[in-house]
Curated annotation (Swiss-Prot):
Catalysis performed (reactions): L-seryl-[protein] + ATP = O-phospho-L-seryl-[protein] + ADP + H(+); L-threonyl-[protein] + ATP = O-phospho-L-threonyl-[protein] + ADP + H(+)
UniProt EC number: 2.7.11.1
Organism expressing this protein natively: Theileria annulata
A Gene Ontology BP annotation from the UniProt entry: regulation of cell cycle
Subunit structure and binding partners: Tetramer of two alpha and two beta chains.
Any one GO MF annotation of this record: protein serine kinase activity
Job of this protein: Casein kinases are operationally defined by their preferential utilization of acidic proteins such as caseins as substrates. The alpha chain contains the catalytic site.
UniProtKB keywords: ATP-binding, Cytoplasm, Kinase, Nucleotide-binding, Serine/threonine-protein kinase, Transferase
GO cellular component: cytosol; nucleus; protein kinase CK2 complex
Active-site residues, as the UniProt record annotates them: D172
Protein name per the record: Casein kinase II subunit alpha
Family, as annotated: Belongs to the protein kinase superfamily. Ser/Thr protein kinase family. CK2 subfamily.
First and last residue of the signal peptide: none
Binding site for ATP: I61, G62, R63, G64, K65, F66, S67, E68, V69, K84
Length: 348
């Protein structure tokens, strides 16, 4: 459900970070410097916790390393809600998640934080969210039509563009964190526990995201990443849904994950990426990476997915799944891509 950055261990670094080439993102690079510390300085906020008397737990719906998630009931309004009970974790991390959710409140397709409560006896903190009647992605994705896929990916991009426009990277986009009420055609992006404010030229932990959706920058210990990490994860999701191969890049560990990516995108562009940023391969890669030519997307087409594949979606994947994070399409650019033409035309 959720995970957390593990403290970085210097001896595990794959290359020295000095003399690295840093390129700022195409858009929203200076959002936080314009907004100022009162917007992004979560460590110094004072939270006002309410008591949990108005909420009742109905049933458990999920758990992660750092929380347990329940369907709940607001006993005053009789509305369903979701209760995320946080396990003991650093106060700083809790403050960050809450500050980000508060900053994004009202944004398109962003899960709404309704309340924050703390049990007076146990001091256990909980976050109260709006309820979404979600269908598990393993059940839902195989049933989606191409129109459904366009609609939901567009809604996800809309959430992502808003989040980035507010100076925030999600850093854990994956099917488990995208709630879909298919009957009502509602999508919500959840689990902001790994989200972080973007500041230019700041080093970030590479121990974020979930393996199958990790961008190459995380796998090669490139710490000066930015919003473009999220578009890689969306590209992985889109490829998985379109080709009915979930997860699309199925690595057994972080090293193997990059190998799985290289077997599709080829090793030539990967070497180019390393040269551009002055990166060095970890010794572990020397033996396992090999040489691979770029595979055309048509190699993944078969009789069960061919009705979903088009030149437009393959072109969009080409623009999302790019080693060099600075060359990836942005969410706003992606929303203008011809793949979404009928969605845009219908919403006018």
């Amino acid at each position: 459900m959720d995970q957390m950055e593990v403290p970085d261990n210097d001896k595990n670094r794959k290359y020295p970070t000095k003399d690295l080439k840093i390129i700022l993102p195409k858009t929203y690079a200076d959002v936080n410097s314009k907004k100022g510390p009162e917007y992004w300085d979560y460590e110094n906020i004072t939270l006002k916790w309410n008591v949990p008397d108005s909420y009742e737990i109905v049933r458990k719906i999920g758990r992660g390393k750092f929380s347990e998630v329940f369907e709940g009931l607001n006993t005053v309004t009789k509305d369903k809600c979701v209760i995320k009970i946080l396990k003991p974790v650093k106060k700083k991390k809790i403050k960050r998640e809450i500050k980000i959710l508060q900053n994004l409140r009202g944004g398109p397709n962003i899960i709404k934080l309704l309340d924050i409560v703390k049990d007076p006896q146990s001091r256990t903190p909980s976050l109260i969210f709006e309820h979404v009647n979600n269908t598990d992605f393993k059940t839902l994705y195989p049933t989606l039509t191409i129109q459904d896929i366009k609609y939901y990916i567009y809604q996800l991009l809309k959430a992502m563009n808003y989040c980035h426009s507010q100076g925030i990277m999600h850093r854990d986009i994956k099917p488990h964190n995208v709630m879909i009420d298919h009957e009502k055609k509602i999508l919500r992006l959840i689990d902001w526990g790994l989200a972080e404010f973007y500041h230019p030229e700041q080093e970030y932990s590479v121990r974020v995201a979930t393996r199958y959706y990790k961008g190459p920058e995380l796998l090669v210990d490139m710490r000066y990443y930015d919003y473009s990490l999220d578009i890689w994860s969306i590209g992985c999701m889109l490829a998985g849904i379109i080709f009915k191969k979930e997860p699309f890049f199925y690595g057994h560990d972080n090293y193997d994950q990059l190998v799985k990516i290289a077997k599709v995108l080829g090793t030539e562009d990967l070497h180019r990426y390393f040269e551009k940023y002055g990166l060095k391969f970890a010794p572990a890669y020397q033996e396992i990476l090999g040489n691979h030519s770029k595979k055309p997307w048509t190699k993944f087409v078969h009789h069960e997915n061919q009705h979903l594949v088009s030149p437009e979606v393959m072109d969009l994947l080409d623009r999302m799944l790019v080693y060099d994070h600075t060359k990836r399409i942005t969410p706003l650019e992606a929303m203008e891509h011809p793949f979404f033409n009928e969605i845009k035309n219908n919403s006018v």
